[in-house]
Design a protein with these regions (language model features):
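A cross-family kinase active-site recognition segment
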Residues: 97-98, 118-183, 203-205, 237-238
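Short pocket-lining segment of the protein kinase catalytic domain that shapes the ATP-binding cleft
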Residues: 108-116
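Active-site acidic catalytic loop and adjacent metal/ATP-binding pocket
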Residues: 36-50, 193-243
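Protein kinase-like catalytic domain
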Residues: 77, 139-143, 249, 253
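A conserved alpha-helical element in kinase catalytic cores
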Residues: 57-106, 120-137
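Juxta-kinase regulatory segment immediately upstream of eukaryotic protein kinase catalytic domains
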Residues: 1-33
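Active-site activation/catalytic loop segments of kinase-like enzymes and analogous catalytic loops
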Residues: 242-277, 291-320
Length: 326
């Protein structure tokens, strides 16, 4: 039995207790398993009818919910937050939630049911700008409810780049342009001490979403092109705001035309500035450091998450930036 199947069975067994906890407002639940969802939560579609209304609202039910995801969702989009601000939250609105169910220490949430996720093949400039604006609002709101920190443990960039060199040298997987990779990684290795010092000393001023890609950016309605919401908070971490911008950018390395000229780093910087957030000094240089470090890890991770087009784009970044940052 898979983890998804076991949590599905648990959810079905606890459904009567869940509906009782919701005091009759929660309707029948249609449980389903999505291939893209992170973690082992069961997800169900239902309707919510408030005690003072006869108009049902489409909702999504999730259980069990991990501590971090529960805390962020309820803090940023719970009823208390909604009363404190007239602005639409950057996450799905939380309708009901609790950390106990049926006598078990088991967290669950009921949230508004959103429209479709952004479709990469159908993205517009407006979609991308709206997506980065909701990321900026997440940064602002998260910092308001919890101080940012602590500083994360440094990543083993040297170990990953060394593994990349071995993958290319020993041809552990087939990656095109191996000679160019050899040369780019050789130059990168010489720069690593400076690059890692620079990156590890970056300001830690933001709660980063950590997983900003189209499947985690949802429309609030089927035809809503501006009011978006983020989902999947399993990778939220303290870091630099540029990490979210570059994570989204990297999803398009293999097909940059799909960005329609939108530059995620600069667009997120403008959105944050409009909200009064400090972007720091010389973030463009820090972004290049991050791009080069990540590009140098692509061969090491190729077997699990690579593609020829992505590797080609990463090589282009590596060759450009080893010269620029030398």
């Amino acid at each position: 039995m898979t983890q998804g199947e076991s949590t599905h069975d648990l959810a079905v067994a606890l459904e009567p207790a869940l509906r009782e906890a919701c005091r009759g407002s929660l309707g029948d639940i249609e449980w389903f398993i999505t291939a893209a969802q992170r973690g082992g939560a069961a997800t169900g579609a239902s309707n919510w009818t408030p005690a003072d209304s006869d108009q049902p609202q489409p909702v999504i039910v999730k259980l069990p919910v991990g501590p971090a995801e529960f805390a962020w969702n309820t803090a940023l989009a719970g009823p208390d937050r909604a009363h404190a601000s007239a602005e639409t939250p950057p996450l799905p609105r939380v309708i009901a939630s609790h950390t106990e169910l049926g006598g078990y220490d088991l967290a669950w949430i009921v949230v508004e049911r959103l429209g479709p996720a952004l479709a990469p093949a159908e993205l517009t400039k407006e979609d991308l700008r709206a997506a980065l604006e909701v990321v900026a609002r997440f940064h602002r709101d998260a910092a308001e409810v919890r101080p940012v920190g602590p500083r994360p443990q440094p990543r083993d960039w040297a170990g990953l780049v060394d593994r990349s060199r071995r993958v290319i040298r020993d041809r552990l997987v087939h990656i095109p342009d191996d000679q160019r990779w050899n040369e780019a990684l050789r130059k990168l290795t010489k720069l690593l001490p400076t690059l890692t010092r620079t990156w590890d000393a970056r300001p830690i001023e933001t709660w980063c979403h950590g997983d900003v890609h189209c499947a985690n950016i949802m429309r609030r309605g089927p035809d809503d092109h501006e009011d978006l919401a983020l989902i999947d908070l399993g990778l939220v971490h303290a870091g630099s705001w540029i990490e979210d911008a570059l994570y989204l950018e990297r999803q398009f390395w293999a097909h940059p035309d799909a960005l329609h000229g939108v530059k995620p780093l600069q667009t997120l910087a403008r959105a944050r500035k409009a909200l009064g957030l400090d972007n720091g000094e010389d973030y463009a240089h820090l972004a290049h450091v991050r791009r080069l470090l990540v590009a140098g890890c692509v061969p090491a991770l190729y077997a699990d998450e690579g593609s020829p087009a992505y590797a080609k784009a990463a090589l282009g970044w590596a060759e450009k930036l080893v010269k620029q940052l030398a």
